[in-house]
Structures are given as structure tokens and as C-alpha cells.
């Protein structure tokens, strides 16, 4: 897929940068305690796209890094002055030291990955998180009839829907203490 296609697609069908930032702000309260415990802790955002979440983290004084493979998305993130790298999510995680991150986030990336890659992502995330660290994955909810029958398939890069019970089971199976969907 050309580097300009997916960026144009996202801008037309996902929402403006401002709208996405408004939606993602929901997750900030989950990080408050971690920021207090680890004031210099780093959050990595895989599949960072245009960097909306990274902007929110910057605005809240949270050290971060974004990782993506799409040149068009990375170009926008770099234009915004964000700290991003072009790298596969597993390569990134494998390059991180044990207990080096306070959180790993991935908004609308899980549904793009083969399930085996998602399993490895969860396993590696547990290794790189500091005690009490968080894994936050947001994905379209196929239990919503409109999402499960139509809008999920609008994105040609989606592999398969991930039902909430499956997404909740995955981190528990690989050693996380709890999971919430």
C-alpha cells in the first residue's frame, strides 16, 4: 500500500487529529499513578500513526516514543515534532531492556496483526514493563453490530475482529495479573 494511501484513508474515515485526541484522552487517568511512581518513565506507542496519543502524552509531561511502519503516518508525526521510529512492533519490543517502560499502548493496531504476532507482542510487553506497568490495546468491538458487520471491514488492512473475551484472555494467559475490556 502506498505511503500516502493509508494516511489519506485515516484522515477521511477515522477522524481529525483533534477528534482522535479527544477520544484518546479517555486513557490519561489510567496513567496518573504510574507517572507519580515513575516520574521519568517512558510510554511506547506501537502503531503510533499520526501521533495523536504522543501529542497528548507530551502535553501532559509524559516521556514517550512512537513506533510505526507507515511512512505517510510517520511523516505527519515527524512534522509535529514527535519522537518516532520506523520499526516493526516486535523488533522494537525485542530491543527494549527488561522493565524499561511504564506502559505500552496500541490503539487500533491489534486487529492489523496476525494472531501469532499479537501473542508475541503480549509476551514481550510483560517483560519490558516496570512493576505495575500497563498494556493498553484498543480495537474495534465486533460485539457492536455496526462494527462487526460493516465498519471493521472498511479498513483494507484489518486482519480479523478480536472479540473482547479473547482480548481479555490473552494477557492473562501470558502472565498479566488482570485484564479489563
Cite the ranges covered by each PLM segment.
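A short glycine-rich, Lys/Arg-flanked "PGG" loop and its adjoining helix->strand segment in the class I
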Residues: 119-134
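Short alpha-helix
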Residues: 159-175
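A short His-aromatic
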Residues: 111-113
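Hydrophobic/aromatic residues located in beta-strands of well-ordered beta-sheets
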Residues: 64, 135-137
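Conserved S-adenosyl-L-methionine
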Residues: 176-181
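Conserved catalytic-core motifs of eukaryotic protein kinase domains, centered on the activation segment
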Residues: 116-117, 148
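Short, glycine-/aromatic-enriched active-site segment of Class I SAM-dependent methyltransferases
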Residues: 137-158
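Conserved N-terminal segment of class I S-adenosyl-L-methionine
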Residues: 1-99, 103, 107, 117-122
Amino acid at each position: 500500500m502506498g505511503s500516502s494511501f493509508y494516511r489519506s484513508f485515516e484522515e477521511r474515515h477515522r477522524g481529525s487529529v483533534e477528534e482522535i485526541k479527544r477520544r484518546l484522552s479517555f486513557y490519561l487517568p489510567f496513567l496518573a499513578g504510574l507517572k507519580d511512581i515513575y516520574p521519568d518513565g517512558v510510554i511506547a506507542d506501537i502503531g503510533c500513526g499520526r501521533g495523536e496519543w504522543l501529542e497528548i502524552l507530551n502535553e501532559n509531561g509524559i516521556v514517550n516514543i512512537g513506533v510505526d511502519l507507515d511512512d505517510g503516518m510517520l511523516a505527519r508525526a515527524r512534522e509535529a515534532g514527535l519522537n518516532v521510529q520506523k520499526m516493526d512492533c516486535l523488533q522494537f519490543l525485542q530491543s527494549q531492556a527488561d522493565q524499561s517502560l511504564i506502559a505500552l499502548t496500541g490503539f487500533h493496531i491489534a486487529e492489523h496483526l496476525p494472531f501469532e504476532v499479537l501473542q508475541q507482542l503480549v509476551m514481550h510487553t510483560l517483560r519490558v514493563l516496570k512493576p505495575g506497568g500497563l498494556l493498553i490495546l484498543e480495537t474495534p468491538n465486533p460485539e457492536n453490530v455496526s462494527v462487526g458487520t460493516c465498519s471493521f471491514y472498511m479498513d483494507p488492512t484489518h486482519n480479523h475482529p478480536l472479540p473482547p473475551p479473547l482480548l481479555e484472555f490473552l494477557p492473562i494467559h501470558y502472565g498479566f495479573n488482570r485484564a479489563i475490556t
